[in-house]
């Protein structure tokens, strides 16, 4: 055997057929949907095992001991990465901020909830330069507490401790963030193919949804100004848009920018040409550390990060009003840093405002501001807020503490997901709060009695099932928002979403509310039923009866205990971000979307934590039950709509039907009988993808073959119950 034949097949060298160098299917067929998005984070990839309970592990921690270790680390400067002014606080605040700051409101993705800063692409984003060192500084603490403390929680807790160590009382801390063990492939970070490039703005300057940052590889905006142009007013417009896309209002934005820049410094000792590859591209022997710096010592006073150089205020390791005092106390002139980045220096700086160098005794420098910082002074909306904070230190401190808590906890989910002794008692509207109840929930006999009453209301199976789905399927796993608990389907804005068929919804809910009122009046002082439970129970009962009509006997799991939220507990603007632009399960698609319907179906299924078989089973069941949002016959491949069967798959796979697109409709197809040439069915792209896509067709064949009907009923029932309980964090 030759040496070439003996080469390792995973090395990327040698034969053209080695796996590491092979051209992928996605290269050949880039338009094909990626079902891998539905099967991320396989339990087999988790070294802790499927039985590991992080909630239990975290609750066993001595949280005060962890915080004491973090406090000690703040001033334990290491020679391999020395702390600025002997304090790592600024570095850890940036690390925590950049972990949480990837969150965007539009789809709930990003954020601090999974420790994804450890993996590509975030670990190698230009805006995260040198945060690999921050995580390595934390490693001894992570190693000490092991699996009882996730990286995701440790990163945020380190930021909290950094703030407290420098004099800011925080609003609290909640644990509960479970680590992932591989990159998240479902997050769309943009279409750009080079760092710090911008192809996400349209001709009117709007950022492509769901993105929030202005350039590829940035957390927020370019600190030098839009596209590197040092224009504070234009920067203010970008800052406002970006922070709003991350769920922050104007006051929260000013507080966060000013509060974050109260500490630490920016680093731009020399041009970025001195930096080596990022962590993902670094040499093997660097063990995951990137941005090796060839300038002078490569660290300390010679550090290169953003290219901007300097601190914002005197005393960069203490919480005070210095940021605003500098911002409004001077006129500012444009300069370039040693790295060539645009930044601003004060005119005629006073001697007492010169800032001692972070590492070199006897050397000092004036304060600096970025273009984005100056937007707080020159933007007409931000300026009065900033001046108010300048004159009211307590208001500034409180606003920053609350905004920081929101920033770092936004994607953790409802308060029932919060762990630890430092969880604040205060309830915030952005947490989508739910009321507490003291009455007992309905028991099994009551459930059975209510089922019969609900089925006898005169409402159709389709009306009951579609209402339950509309309630539960608002859930998104990205930030654990939405879902059936709270019955917010009856409140603004959800009750008026086009997808939810408002007129039908109003009629169905009025009937269910009457059932609820009768039951609760009959059981005063005892068990009570919430509308949230009734919505789910009615849909589940209708599913069971539709299955029974075709001989399928399935018991749909139902667990009571949901509560009803009030309008006062519901932030309309925030909840409107959950409004679906497409729902393939109900054959709903807005006409102005650039993505194909089948791509949006996979995205929706991923947010509902569904596998490809679960998604397939639900689609097949929904079609024969006639659950299209508008009542159309599109995809209803059955002669007995409303009865549960595997007809959708049987007829989809029938070779005697020939399909062709309907002229003038991008999402509509006509199926004709190949013999008679008569129309048979109409279908959407979502319907036909289950016969077109090889993997989905393979699953569809299982449901369309002999024995498929019983399997479909069981799988549909399980998937339905799963979706109905996605937001039941109280059951954890």
Swiss-Prot record:
Q: Please give the Gene Ontology molecular function terms for this protein.
A: catalase activity; heme binding; metal ion binding
The feature of type site (Transition state stabilizer) is located at 94
Q: Which domain of life is it from?
A: Bacteria
Q: How is it modified after translation?
A: Formation of the three residue Trp-Tyr-Met cross-link is important for the catalase, but not the peroxidase activity of the enzyme.
Q: Which GO terms describe its biological process?
A: cellular response to hydrogen peroxide; hydrogen peroxide catabolic process
Where is the region Disordered?
1-21
Q: Where would one find coiled-coil regions in this protein?
A: none
Q: Name one GO cellular component term.
A: cytosol
Signal peptide per UniProt:
1-22
Q: What class of enzyme is it?
A: oxidoreductase
Q: Where is the cross-link described as Tryptophyl-tyrosyl-methioninium (Tyr-Met) (with W-97)?
A: 220-246
Give the co-factor note. Binds 1 heme b (iron(II)-protoporphyrin IX) group per dimer.
| Residues reported in the UniProt entry to bind heme b | 261
Obligatory cofactor(s): heme b
Keywords of the record, alphabetical order, are: Heme, Hydrogen peroxide, Iron, Metal-binding, Oxidoreductase, Peroxidase, Signal
> Tryptophyl-tyrosyl-methioninium (Trp-Tyr) (with M-246) cross-link located where?
97-220
Reactions that this protein is recorded to catalyse: H2O2 + AH2 = A + 2 H2O; 2 H2O2 = O2 + 2 H2O
Q: Which catalytic residues are annotated? A: 98 (proton acceptor)
Under which EC number(s) is this enzyme classified?
1.11.1.21
The UniProt subunit note reads as follows: Homodimer or homotetramer.
Q: Family per UniProt?
A: Belongs to the peroxidase family. Peroxidase/catalase subfamily.
Which purpose does this protein serve, as stated in its record? Bifunctional enzyme with both catalase and broad-spectrum peroxidase activity.
* Protein name per UniProt: Catalase-peroxidase
Origin species: Synechococcus sp. (strain RCC307)
- Its gene is katG
